[in-house]
């Protein structure tokens, strides 16, 4: 594919992403063509079907989502990293718009859109797990983080959290990210402290006599 062809394809994908954010999966090829500034025929030169176009645009969105979430550097601290990461996440949630709510609804879908919906679900689970493990490490957590911490991370990263605090409370994505970062930092630190306390409660101090098992 030539440089010119790559540019046209990228323009079509950007148009599709913008329309998906506004209209969701009900978007028409005509809408994408108008936003991209090309003809409907040009769109079909690059994508055989409407579903193939939408799937490519959503896949492009998912790839950019992961690229925008910062990874902590060697000197990173929990509060700073959570703030940067959650601001990035909620910016992306706001940009992706309506289509992500539809994909997260759990509605049965077939064909390439069904494949993309399943891929999105898998990618989200992987992101939540990676995010949880990183936050736990930065909080000096011991052992594995409890499941409720992962659940809390999932809720705080969700596009539904962006939407809940956006229109109803007039918060910008940056404000949403910073607010939820503070809440999540408290939750993760609390869980890490609980894990230490439980470890002390179950581990006898050095030199303490071991409890003998009663004879059966």
Walk through the language-model features, giving the residues of each.
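Hydrophobic/aromatic-rich alpha-helical bundle segments in the mid-to-C-terminal region
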Residues: 135-183, 191-216
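Amphipathic alpha-helical packing segments from all-alpha helical-bundle domains
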Residues: 91-95, 101-102, 112-140, 147-151, ...
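Helical hydrophobic small-molecule/effector-binding pocket
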Residues: 59, 80-106, 126
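Amphipathic alpha-helical linker/stalk segments
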Residues: 21-22, 27, 34, 55-85
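DNA major-groove recognition helix of helix-turn-helix
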Residues: 16, 47, 57-58
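Basic, helix-initiating cap at the start of DNA-binding domains
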Residues: 1-35, 51-52, 213-214
């Amino acid at each position: 594919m030539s440089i010119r062809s790559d540019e046209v394809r990228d323009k079509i994908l950007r148009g599709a992403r913008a329309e998906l954010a506004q209209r969701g999966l009900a978007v028409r090829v005509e809408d994408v063509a108008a936003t991209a500034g090309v003809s409907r025929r040009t769109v079909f030169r690059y994508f055989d079907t409407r579903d193939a176009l939408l799937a490519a645009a959503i896949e492009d969105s998912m790839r950019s989502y992961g690229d925008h979430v910062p990874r902590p550097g060697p000197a990173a601290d929990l509060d700073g990293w959570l703030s940067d990461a959650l601001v990035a996440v909620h910016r992306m949630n706001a940009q992706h718009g309506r289509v992500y709510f539809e994909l997260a609804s759990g509605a049965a879908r077939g064909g390439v859109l069904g494949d993309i919906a399943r891929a999105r679900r898998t990618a989200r689970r992987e992101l939540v797990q990676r995010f949880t493990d990183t936050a736990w490490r930065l909080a000096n957590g011991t052992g594995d983080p409890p499941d409720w911490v992962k659940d809390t991370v999932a809720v705080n990263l969700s596009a539904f959290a962006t939407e809940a605090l956006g229109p109803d409370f007039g918060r910008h994505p940056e404000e949403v990210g910073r607010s939820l970062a503070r809440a999540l930092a408290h939750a993760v630190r609390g869980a890490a402290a609980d894990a230490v306390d439980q470890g002390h409660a179950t581990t006898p101090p050095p030199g303490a006599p071991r409890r003998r098992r009663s004879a059966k």
